[in-house]
Regions:
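Catalytic nucleophile-loop/oxyanion-hole region of alpha/beta-hydrolase
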Residues: 55, 81-120, 311, 315-317
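The serine-hydrolase catalytic nucleophile loop
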Residues: 52-64, 78
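Short beta-strand/loop motif that positions the catalytic acidic residue
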Residues: 266, 273-275
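Alpha/beta-hydrolase-fold enzymes
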Residues: 133-225
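Short beta-strand element of the alpha/beta-hydrolase
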Residues: 40-50
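Catalytic active-site module of serine/aspartate enzymes centered on a nucleophile-bearing elbow/loop
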Residues: 304-307, 311-330
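Conserved alpha/beta-hydrolase
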Residues: 65-84
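N-terminal cap/lid segment of alpha/beta-hydrolase-fold proteins
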Residues: 2-40, 310
Length: 330
């Protein structure tokens, strides 16, 4: 049964593929093939994200569209989620997710019909930071684009718009540390939230968020956008964002290992950062742009919010993406 959540192009062939990262975790991807792909060595695009999503959602939509424009394109599930391996489920790692991109480069660059010197990456939402981090070290990635970037290390350790006070950060660290004792004693990983809010007494809200059956009136616009994507038009049974919570201690690694510390080292390879004009996450792309060396470009999409760039074909600038990669994957 095909569980993709977007319109399927009948002229674009998709194959299920398997490959391993250097930790031995088997990753599963959907490989999208342009017409007449076997007749030549093609440029290739690797796509992952959003954070907690699966390849049957936004990354698959992007991969299929890029294949329709002449690229061999791979959308994959990062470790610990979707159809990919990893004995612990519903967790994430900045290191391993970064490695997953390079493992995808290993795989796609070995295909007979791919030019391994013409490989680019698209990172969506929370997989953007890993895409840039991978490109900073893996020079086989010749160009990188990010869509609706979310810096997950910064988000988890500093809060939205860096809102955590030092006292709040200390409380979160203590909660995560004590939760490790509880998990060790129980022999299981308790569910929790990767973004921790505080109550009126300035204590961390640690209970796993319960998603309402219907969107409440007056819901925060960002929450409403996520809800309408993950629970309505693009719901998928394997997506963490739909079926369950993350493991409570998952943020520990993101506190310890900041993403994109090597962003300047992507240069002289180009970076394209795309964000919605009205996105609550826009500042991540703007700050990454300031931190990166040339060549770099920041593209703000008028009227778009964060989730618009997941699946709104009128807002996603595919013409720009195609131009960017054709110019830089020569």
């Amino acid at each position: 049964m095909d569980t993709r959540t977007f319109e399927i192009y009948l002229n674009i062939k998709m194959e299920k593929v398997h490959f391993k990262n250097r930790y031995g975790i088997e990753l599963v991807g959907d490989l999208y093939l342009p017409e007449n792909h076997a007749a030549q060595k093609n440029p290739a695009i690797i796509v992952a994200g959003p954070f907690g999503a699966v390849k049957e959602q936004a990354s698959g939509l992007y991969a299929q569209q890029m294949a329709a424009c002449g690229f061999v394109a791979l959308a994959f599930d990062p470790s610990f989620g979707g159809e990919s391996g990893g004995s612990v489920r519903n967790t994430a790692s900045p290191d391993i997710f970064t490695e997953d991109y390079s493992a995808a480069v290993d795989y796609i660059g070995m295909l007979d019909f791919v030019n391994r010197n013409r490989i680019g990456v698209i990172g969506i939402c929370g997989l953007s930071g890993m895409a840039i981090t991978a490109a900073g070290t893996d020079t086989r990635i010749k160009a990188v684009a990010t869509m609706s970037m979310y810096d997950m290390s910064r988000d988890m350790s500093r809060g939205h718009m860096d809102c955590y006070s030092e006292e709040q950060r200390a409380k979160i660290k203590d909660y995560l540390s004590q939760q490790r004792w509880r998990d060790a004693e129980n022999g299981t990983f308790a569910p929790g939230n990767h973004e921790i809010d505080f109550d009126e007494m300035d204590e961390p809200l640690t209970a796993a968020m319960e998603v309402p059956a219907e969107l409440p009136e007056g819901a925060d616009p960002a929450f409403a956008a996520f809800y309408n994507y993950y629970y309505k038009r693009a719901c998928h049974p394997r997506a963490v964002n739909f079926v369950s919570s993350w493991t409570a201690t998952m943020p520990v690694a993101f506190w310890s290992f900041p993403l994109m510390a090597n962003i300047k080292e992507v240069s002289p390879r180009p970076i394209l950062l795309v964000a919605g004009e009205n996105a609550h996450s826009r500042y991540y792309s703007e700050d990454a742009y300031k931190a990166a060396n040339e060549p770099k470009e920041l593209l703000i999409i008028p009227g778009a919010d964060h989730v618009s760039l997941y699946d709104d074909m009128e807002k996603i600038p595919f013409d720009k993406l195609v131009q960017f990669f054709k110019e830089n994957l020569k």
